[in-house]
């Protein structure tokens, strides 16, 4: 009997994937996922139309997370642009690189962003609602109650498992466990990803 391993991905960041996969995808590329296909959105108008449609869904007291924005296709992003479309629906537009995100005022209020705490060099532009690189950490710490909510994070890990198997991978690795919350991530990763499947 010959056993051949599947693909190995040593740089997947399971926690990052578990956070992203439950989000609404609005991307310039087509995504074929086990639970459906996401058609590409390749211009600012299309992005705004999709954001407008998403802003009317879900509970009013829950932030809307949109992943996949990129300025080359979707144009410049800002707090004002989000507010012109999503109004007072708390909305987070996460860049496809994962290294930056934008929030409208409703989202910043909901998660407790305090303008007086923002100092020069923090890589945060409060007027644009833009949190990038180091400033992303500030935003993530405030978004954790939503992105790491046990049911949402567990659902993201289950989606990750589906995606990994869908792509023919049998082994994944991560060098960034703990980027959100080490103990919560380690426990959930062990519970949902360890095992025979």
At which residue positions do the language-model features occur?
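Divalent metal-binding segments
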Residues: 1-196
């Amino acid at each position: 009997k010959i056993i051949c391993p599947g693909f190995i991905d040593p740089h997947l960041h399971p926690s990052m994937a578990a956070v992203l996969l439950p989000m609404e995808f609005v991307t310039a590329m087509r995504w074929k996922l086990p639970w459906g296909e996401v058609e590409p959105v390749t211009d600012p108008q299309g992005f705004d139309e999709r954001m407008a449609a998403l802003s009317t869904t879900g509970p009013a007291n829950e932030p809307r997370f949109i992943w996949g924005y990129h300025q080359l296709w979707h144009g410049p992003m800002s707090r004002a642009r989000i507010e012109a479309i999503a109004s007072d629906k708390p909305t987070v537009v996460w860049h496809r690189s994962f290294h930056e995100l934008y929030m409208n005022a409703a989202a910043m209020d909901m998660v407790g962003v305090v303008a007086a705490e923002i100092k020069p060099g923090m890589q945060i532009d409060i007027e644009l609602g833009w949190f990038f690189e180091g400033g992303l950490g500030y935003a993530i710490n405030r978004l954790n109650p939503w992105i790491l909510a046990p049911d949402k994070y567990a659902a993201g890990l289950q989606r990750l498992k589906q995606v990994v198997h869908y792509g023919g991978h049998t082994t994944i690795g991560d060098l960034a466990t703990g980027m959100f919350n080490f103990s919560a991530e380690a426990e959930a990763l062990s519970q949902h990803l360890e095992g025979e499947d």
